[in-house]
């Protein structure tokens, strides 16, 4: 049996998330609550920890307070064993400036790599919803001899124009990496599907350091991992693709195997929540063999009183549904739905309250939103448009702490 390689995890968590506004008005995108009990960053951290990659640096930047607090409170590992998950804010090692891109974030954090001296570096994004065993991708990277490996998910060619697309040969070597092409390349075994980059990369350490340092000296670079570093390594013949459909996650069902969602817009964020609520969900939160770890707050169980009910819904701990109806919705912790209220097809974040006789439909309510008695959200879009953000798909989004 070969010795396990020394792997360092780097999570890119500096995303501002403008397209998720107002959910990102007061927090970084990876800190946005998701699924009733989690934040977006919990998915990548769970995947790394489940694979026993237990030395992880989370590079943060914009509005990172709630993200830093979440990591420190809910992701404490054993320091005695040399294990850690640590948030690393912009260090300004090169002067008083923020990170100029994801590659620059790593460049300004090279000291972390030198201190750890890993064999390989796992560089993953922080704002996607999925399960993955990264150890399988690391094994393929080592066996292939590539300097960089990019996780690719298969999508129909007609849907690939909005993503970074991978053109690879039959051996998995990447011939070209193209951002949002008008004519996406097919995969070697299926011309009607395209490998789309998931924003997850494995690097041999020296290859990453050399590429990052060369990129830092390039005045014409945007200093982006997907836009600059990967194309540079593709041109050097050093990059390979990992087919995400080959990833076997313990406990996965046929229905949710290969599930991955970019939730960078309000509509995508909403749709990913609707994937959770059916009897046989598209994405199963209840896989005990590959758990998603989230908030560790000690809360009372959810309670349904006075005939209150929830159908095809996820309801978080501490919530109370009193003589109200909840359908096809995801409610986070400590949500109260009062007598006679109706919540349908909605996402309700922690601490929100829906008052007596109120109606909430096709909406996202951020933390601590209060919908007053008899008020309506998502019923009259023209009226809502004057008060709230509305997505292209007609989802009403109400920002944190708003009273209606």
UniProtKB/Swiss-Prot annotation:
<dbReference type="InterPro" id="IPR023049">
    <property type="entry name" value="GlgC_bac"/>
</dbReference>
<dbReference type="GO" id="GO:0045227">
    <property type="term" value="P:capsule polysaccharide biosynthetic process"/>
</dbReference>
<keyword id="KW-0547">Nucleotide-binding</keyword>
<protein>
    <recommendedName>
        <fullName>Glucose-1-phosphate adenylyltransferase</fullName>
        <ecNumber>2.7.7.27</ecNumber>
    </recommendedName>
</protein>
<keyword id="KW-0548">Nucleotidyltransferase</keyword>
<keyword id="KW-0119">Carbohydrate metabolism</keyword>
<dbReference type="InterPro" id="IPR029044">
    <property type="entry name" value="Nucleotide-diphossugar_trans"/>
</dbReference>
<keyword id="KW-0067">ATP-binding</keyword>
<comment type="function">
    <text>Involved in the biosynthesis of ADP-glucose, a building block, required in the biosynthesis of maltose-1-phosphate (M1P) and in the elongation reactions to produce linear alpha-1,4-glucans. Catalyzes the reaction between ATP and alpha-D-glucose 1-phosphate (G1P) to produce pyrophosphate and ADP-Glc.</text>
</comment>
<dbReference type="InterPro" id="IPR011004">
    <property type="entry name" value="Trimer_LpxA-like_sf"/>
</dbReference>
<feature type="binding site">
    <location>
        <position position="197"/>
    </location>
    <ligand>
        <name>alpha-D-glucose 1-phosphate</name>
    </ligand>
</feature>
<dbReference type="Pfam" id="PF00483">
    <property type="entry name" value="NTP_transferase"/>
</dbReference>
<keyword id="KW-0808">Transferase</keyword>
<dbReference type="InterPro" id="IPR011831">
    <property type="entry name" value="ADP-Glc_PPase"/>
</dbReference>
<dbReference type="GO" id="GO:0008878">
    <property type="term" value="F:glucose-1-phosphate adenylyltransferase activity"/>
</dbReference>
<feature type="binding site">
    <location>
        <position position="164"/>
    </location>
    <ligand>
        <name>alpha-D-glucose 1-phosphate</name>
    </ligand>
</feature>
<keyword id="KW-0321">Glycogen metabolism</keyword>
<comment type="pathway">
    <text>Capsule biogenesis; capsule polysaccharide biosynthesis.</text>
</comment>
<dbReference type="Pfam" id="PF24894">
    <property type="entry name" value="Hexapep_GlmU"/>
</dbReference>
<dbReference type="InterPro" id="IPR005836">
    <property type="entry name" value="ADP_Glu_pyroP_CS"/>
</dbReference>
<comment type="pathway">
    <text>Glycan biosynthesis; glycogen biosynthesis.</text>
</comment>
<dbReference type="InterPro" id="IPR005835">
    <property type="entry name" value="NTP_transferase_dom"/>
</dbReference>
<feature type="binding site">
    <location>
        <position position="99"/>
    </location>
    <ligand>
        <name>alpha-D-glucose 1-phosphate</name>
    </ligand>
</feature>
<feature type="binding site">
    <location>
        <begin position="179"/>
        <end position="180"/>
    </location>
    <ligand>
        <name>alpha-D-glucose 1-phosphate</name>
    </ligand>
</feature>
<dbReference type="InterPro" id="IPR056818">
    <property type="entry name" value="GlmU/GlgC-like_hexapep"/>
</dbReference>
<comment type="similarity">
    <text>Belongs to the bacterial/plant glucose-1-phosphate adenylyltransferase family.</text>
</comment>
<dbReference type="GO" id="GO:0005524">
    <property type="term" value="F:ATP binding"/>
</dbReference>
<keyword id="KW-0320">Glycogen biosynthesis</keyword>
<dbReference type="GO" id="GO:0005978">
    <property type="term" value="P:glycogen biosynthetic process"/>
</dbReference>
């Amino acid at each position: 049996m070969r010795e396990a390689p020394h792997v360092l995890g780097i999570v890119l968590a500096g995303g501002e998330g403008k397209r998720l506004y107002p959910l990102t008005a007061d927090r970084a995108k990876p800190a946005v609550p998701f699924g009733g009990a989690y934040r977006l960053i919990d998915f990548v951290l769970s995947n790394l920890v489940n694979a026993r990659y237990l030395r992880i640096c989370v590079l943060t930047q914009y509005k990172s307070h709630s993200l830093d607090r979440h990591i420190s409170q809910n992701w404490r590992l054993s320091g005695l064993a040399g294990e850690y998950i640590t948030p690393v804010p912009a260090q300004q090692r090169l002067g008083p400036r923020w990170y100029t891109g994801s590659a620059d974030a790593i460049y300004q954090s090279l000291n972390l790599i030198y201190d750890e001296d890993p064999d390989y570096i796992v560089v993953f994004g922080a704002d996607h919803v999925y399960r993955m065993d990264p150890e399988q991708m690391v094994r393929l990277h080592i066996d292939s001899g590539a300097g960089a490996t990019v996780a690719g998910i298969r999508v129909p060619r007609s849907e690939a124009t909005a993503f970074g697309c991978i053109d690879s040969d039959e051996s998995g070597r990447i011939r070209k990496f193209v951002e949002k092409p008008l004519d996406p390349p097919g995969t070697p075994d299926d011309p009607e599907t395209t490998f789309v980059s998931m924003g997850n990369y494995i690097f041999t350490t020296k290859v990453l350091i050399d590429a990052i340092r060369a990129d830092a000296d390039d005045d014409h670079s945007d200093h982006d991992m997907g836009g600059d570093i990967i194309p540079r390594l593709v041109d050097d013949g050093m990059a390979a693709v990992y087919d995400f459909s080959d990833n076997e996650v313990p406990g996965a069902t046929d229905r949710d195997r290969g599930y991955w969602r970019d939730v960078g817009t309000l509509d995508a964020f909403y749709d990913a929540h609707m994937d959770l609520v059916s009897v046989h969900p598209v994405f199963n939160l209840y896989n005990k063999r590959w758990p998603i770890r989230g908030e560790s707050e000690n809360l009372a169980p959810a309670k349904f009183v006075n005939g209150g009910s929830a159908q095809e819904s996820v309801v978080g701990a501490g919530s109370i549904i009193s003589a109200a109806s909840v359908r096809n919705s995801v409610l986070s912790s400590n949500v109260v739905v009062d007598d006679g209220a109706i919540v349908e097809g909605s996402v309700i974040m922690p601490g929100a309250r829906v008052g007596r006789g109120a109606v909430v439909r096709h909406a996202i309510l951020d933390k601590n939103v209060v919908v007053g008695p008899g008020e309506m959200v998502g019923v009259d879009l023209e009226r809502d448009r004057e008060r709230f953000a509305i997505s292209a798909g007609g989802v009403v989004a109400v920002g944190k702490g708003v009273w209606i």
